[in-house]
Amino acid sequence: MFAAAGVAAQAEEFVMATGQQGGSWYPVGGAIKAIVEREHPDITITVTPGAGVSNVVGVDAGRFAIAFANSISTVDSLTGKEPFRKPTTNVCNLGILYPQYFQIVALADSNIKTVADMKGKGLTTQQLGNTGEFLTRELLSTAGLTYDDLSSVAHTSYSDSASQMKDGHADFFTLGSSLPTGSVMDLASSRKITLVDVDPETFKHFKDQNAAFQLREVKAGAYPGFDETVHAISYDTHMVAPCDYNGDTIKAVLSAIADNPDSFAAISKTMANLTVEEMATDIGIPFHPAAKEFYAERGVAGME
């Protein structure tokens, strides 16, 4: 559980749930921890690995004070849509950090160019409770496929997935992360890879379920040896907290992000030019009262 004491009044310790090692959430969380603890010695943050869906559930249940999440999952949580078992009632938005891309990485010699081509192939993906794993099942369904139609399915970390691909134990690897992703960079350094293009009809399947989905380009050169531009399903990484959580701590975390772009650019290039206006984008999830105050104090219009 987390403490809800004011940062100026007494020491505070809390848990911040991030993502799997080998992805971008975990190191970004580590950078936030370092900056906040440096600037506020009375705050101690424990950064723990997590997953998009389970992080939101954990915040709602009071297990995490702050957590990383995906916009699409958090929107679904408000109504209890699958994979959530019931609606969340105490989850508020803190701000957007950067876009996430649902990447479908295939070995070049696997001949996987469409979802239908995945039949009979080996998959490595995230564990249950991860947004990327849920999206993988949805992706397969667009071609009438399930996990039972694949030769093998592994639920593991990004780094272990990359190792399985290197060793030829899997043909394709699905994940939701920023661009570029370290584990995919590692894979591309030793195996020729392709990214499967998402066509408009496949994207419509996702967009019809959640308006927060976007179709964004992954440019040629995003990874070593990757020489064509493709389209990927995209959404946003943001941070959430219980709606009644300590406002001083919320502002300390948001200040750490907004005032130290260089610290985050080295981890995720897309955070290099992050502005408070972008952080304050309305994604259909209520803002924490302290987050609204923070953005209003920083001059963001419409936050009064």
Give short role names for the model-derived ranges.
Residues G122-E138, A212-I283:
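Ligand-binding clefts/hinges and TM-proximal coupling segments of bilobed small-molecule sensing domains
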Residues F64-Y98, S178-T181:
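Acidic, polar ligand-binding/catalytic clefts
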Residues S71-S73, G80-E82, A108-S110, T146-Y245:
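Pocket-lining segment of extracytoplasmic ligand-binding domains
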Residues F2-A11:
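Sec/Tat signal peptide C-region and signal peptidase I cleavage site
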Residues P27-V28, I35-D60, F226-D227:
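Extracytoplasmic small-molecule ligand-binding "clamshell" domains
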Residues D160, K166-G168, S177-L195, K207-D208, ...:
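An extracytoplasmic/periplasmic, membrane-proximal ligand-sensing/linker region
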Residues A11, H40-D42, A51-S54, A61-F64, ...:
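Extracytoplasmic
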Residues E13-E39, I43, Q100-D167, D262, ...:
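Bilobed "Venus flytrap"/periplasmic-binding protein-like clamshell domains
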